[in-house]
Design a protein with these regions (language model features):
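Acidic/histidine-rich helix-loop elements
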Residues: 57-89, 146-152, 174-181, 215-220, ...
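Extracellular ectodomain segments of secreted/surface proteins
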Residues: 1-20
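N-terminal active-site segment of His-dependent metallophosphoesterases
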Residues: 26-117
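A short C-terminal boundary segment appended to hydrolase-like catalytic domains
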Residues: 15-16, 285-333
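Active-site environment of divalent metal-dependent phosphoester hydrolases
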Residues: 62-65, 114-119, 143-149, 174-177, ...
Length: 333
């Protein structure tokens, strides 16, 4: 198995060989390096670190089987009798890894449950809220809204930290899998972009519609086309908005859309299976880094490796994405 460069920061690189990780720390920023034959460039840094934000999505408390797709006879994955449910294993590992970074804020952007039940949401809040308290901001995803769950259905949320503002949007619609933004939400984001005195990171569950991947129709997987275009218009008009960060697809991906300049529209992979993804945002003066991270606990890595073969062996490449999808720098506009 070839090495997988999972994390590149301004001072750190983590390379996995299957479940085994090699970590280099105290590296110089913005520098081409040869690390045991692996060529990589660290991300830039600008001044002192102002804030750290972590994010996760698609944590799926209550799920018991993964890899199932209706109408497709592919292998599915479940834990053995007596083993802890895999969402418990994976989320405990992610929470521990996040806590070690001492984040100023944590954003969980949807699909916190498998079935949208109150019991599953309570368990999510026990695990994430129990560790992070009032540093936690969360919003529902389609796994909640499909079942008409209204907890987490705040249309907009705003949080201000040193060097950055966090804007969180509820993109989910009741009884519907794909995403939507109302005129009121877009107006609010436009107004926030106009008054913000620092970079704004925008979070939601559903990724943008990408015309390079899907034809124009209302049944797209992510945000419907008209709302995607309206969101792009707001970003184009408000340079304080530096990026949009979503989940939903269970992959790491970055999309550049016409009319949005160099604004990244990002998808962060799922917590619950391979590779066990979450992301860290390092905020500097006029510069924000997205640093992808993979779970580190042995039990979580074991489950992650077991599930890399999902979808007839196609899942690992899809879910992992490119290094440039996972780790990159965003200049304040």
């Amino acid at each position: 198995m070839p090495p997988e460069v999972m994390t590149v920061a301004d001072d750190e690189v983590v390379v996995f060989h299957g479940p085994l990780a090699t970590t280099w720390t105290d590296l110089p920023p913005d520098t081409e390096l040869d690390l045991d034959g692996i060529e990589v460039r660290t991300l830039p840094r600008r001044g002192e670190l102002l804030a750290t934000v972590t994010t996760a999505n698609d944590v799926h408390f209550g799920e018991t089987v993964c890899g199932h797709i209706d109408g497709v006879d592919w292998e599915t994955y479940a834990v053995a009798p007596g083993e802890a449910p895999y969402p418990e294993t994976m989320n405990a590992a992610v929470v521990a890894d996040m806590a070690a970074r001492r984040p100023d804020a944590v954003v969980v952007k949807g699909d916190v449950t498998a079935d949208g039940t109150d019991e599953q949401i309570d368990r999510f809040l026990e695990v994430y809220g129990g560790e992070f308290g009032d540093r936690l901001t969360w919003v529902r995803g389609n796994h909640e809204s499909y079942h008409h769950q209204q907890r987490g259905a705040w249309p907009v949320q705003e949080r201000t930290l040193d060097g950055v503002v966090l804007a969180v949007l509820d993109t989910s619609r009741d009884a519907t899998i794909n995403g939507h933004l109302s005129a009121e939400q877009l107006d609010w984001l436009d107004e926030l972009g106009a008054r913000a005195d620092r970079p704004v990171l925008v979070f939601g569950h559903h990724p943008v519609w990408n015309p390079a991947e899907e034809r124009r129709r209302e049944g797209v997987f992510g945000l419907v086309p008209g709302d995607t275009e309206a969101l792009v218009d707001v970003f184009a008009r408000r340079p304080r908005l530096v990026g949009y960060f979503a989940g939903h697809t269970h992959r790491n991906n970055r999309v550049d859309l016409p009319g949005a300049g160099d604004v990244p529209f990002v998808e962060v992979g799922t917590v619950k299976d391979y590779p066990g993804s979450w992301a860290e945002y390092r905020v500097f003066d006029g510069l924000v880094l997205q640093v992808h991270r993979r779970v580190t606990a042995p039990a979580a890595l074991d489950w992650s490796e077991r599930t890399r073969g999902m979808f007839a062996g196609t899942y690992a490449r899809y879910a992992r994405g490119r290094l440039s999808d996972r780790c990159f720098a965003m200049e304040a506009r």
